[in-house]
């Protein structure tokens, strides 16, 4: 069974505050809203088999609104759950099942595709969740703790080379480079030896700083082609404000799929702005690293999503030694299909962790 952790600590109404009738109507309102995205009226509830008059249902829905669990958008006669209502539903009424065997095979086959690097696997995991869950898939890469163990340049055809950096923790980073004319196997080996002598044991950030500082030395001590390889290697490994922590987002277009009303488009625009806040998103996903299961953040529970009214469902992925490596999840509107997305995120995180173990 998927283990869930609330992303919200503020006090909200409890299920014990509701009698059986109120609990049943509340559940039906939330389930209908999550399915359709439309405000739910008393007639919709009565057609669902509730043995109460529309007037009695309206009175109960009004009571739920006074508790802060339902709200009436604009002039609509229907109700939608508030963020507090969604939290109570997710924590107390949501029935989370499991994913199907076909989806399990899809996730495993795509992540364990032959020759896929760790970087490619994390991007693929994000894309998988985006496709299966209908939101934007998001992955934060592991914190790089190990030092550089080995650097190597490998020829790939006549005009390309691969810069390979192996770390003490066993992970491998690859960068594709343009191979200049005249680069020989001897030049590739000379450049590799030069960098190995200077970078071994350093973190990736330290290695990049050292490579930049050693360019003049390379130009003096190496032949022209080997020196150029070192320079090109520096260019290939540079870039990004926080190179040790990458944030991978796939499926932004999914967020536009059901945004028909103008206010929905404004919400999505704000969510797109949220997705550009790399530091804040990484910080939020780092909070997930301390959880032992799927964690759910709903709307205004987090400062980041307070304007866009979005939800994040995320889980840590970890090595076989139970070391937390990073976090993966799905971002979307608060009416995400929680019952479906939660087990998808949980299983994808587990498979990604196995893949990272090799």
UniProtKB/Swiss-Prot annotation:
A single BP term in Gene Ontology: negative regulation of DNA-templated transcription
GO MF terms, alphabetically ordered: DNA binding
UniProt superkingdom: Bacteria
Disulfide bonds: none
UniProtKB keywords: Repressor, Stress response, Transcription, Transcription regulation
Family: Belongs to the HrcA family.
Name the record gives this protein: Heat-inducible transcription repressor HrcA
Organism: Caulobacter sp. (strain K31)
Gene (UniProt): hrcA
């Amino acid at each position: 069974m998927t283990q869930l952790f609330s992303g919200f600590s503020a006090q909200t109404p409890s299920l014990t505050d509701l009698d059986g009738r109120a609990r049943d109507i509340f559940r039906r309102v939330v389930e209908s809203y999550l399915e359709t995205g439309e405000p739910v009226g008393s007639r919709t509830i009565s057609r669902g088999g509730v043995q109460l008059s529309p007037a009695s249902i309206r009175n109960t829905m009004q009571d739920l609104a006074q508790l802060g669990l339902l709200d009436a958008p604009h002039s609509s006669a229907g109700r939608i759950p508030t963020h507090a209502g969604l939290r109570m539903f997710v924590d107390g009424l949501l029935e989370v099942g499991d994913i199907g065997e076909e989806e399990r095979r899809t996730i495993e086959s795509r992540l364990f595709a032959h020759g896929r690097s760790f970087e490619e696997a994390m991007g693929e995991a994000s894309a998988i969740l985006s496709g299966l869950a209908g939101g934007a898939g998001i992955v934060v890469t592991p914190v790089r703790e190990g030092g550089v163990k080995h650097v190597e340049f490998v020829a790939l055809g006549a005009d390309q080379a691969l810069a390979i950096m192996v770390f003490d923790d066993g992970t491998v980073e690859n960068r594709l480079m343009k191979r200049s004319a005249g680069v020989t196997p001897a030049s590739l080996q000379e450049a590799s030896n030069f960098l190995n002598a200077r970078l071994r044991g350093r973190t990736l950030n330290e290695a990049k700083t050292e490579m930049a500082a050693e360019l003049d030395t390379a130009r003096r001590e190496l032949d022209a082609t080997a020196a150029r390889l070192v320079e090109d290697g520096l260019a290939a490994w540079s870039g990004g404000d926080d190179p040790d922590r990458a944030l991978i987002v796939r499926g932004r277009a999914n967020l536009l799929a059901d945004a028909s009303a103008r206010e929905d488009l404004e919400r999505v625009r704000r969510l797109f702005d949220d997705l550009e806040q790399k530091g804040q998103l990484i910080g939020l996903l780092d909070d997930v690293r301390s959880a032992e299961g799927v964690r759910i953040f709903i709307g205004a529970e987090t400062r980041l999503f307070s304007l866009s009214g979005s939800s994040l469902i995320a889980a840590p992925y970890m090595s076989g030694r139970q070391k937390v490596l990073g976090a993966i999840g799905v971002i979307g509107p608060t009416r995400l299909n929680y019952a479906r997305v939660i087990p998808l995120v949980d299983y994808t995180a587990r498979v990604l962790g196995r893949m990272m173990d090799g």
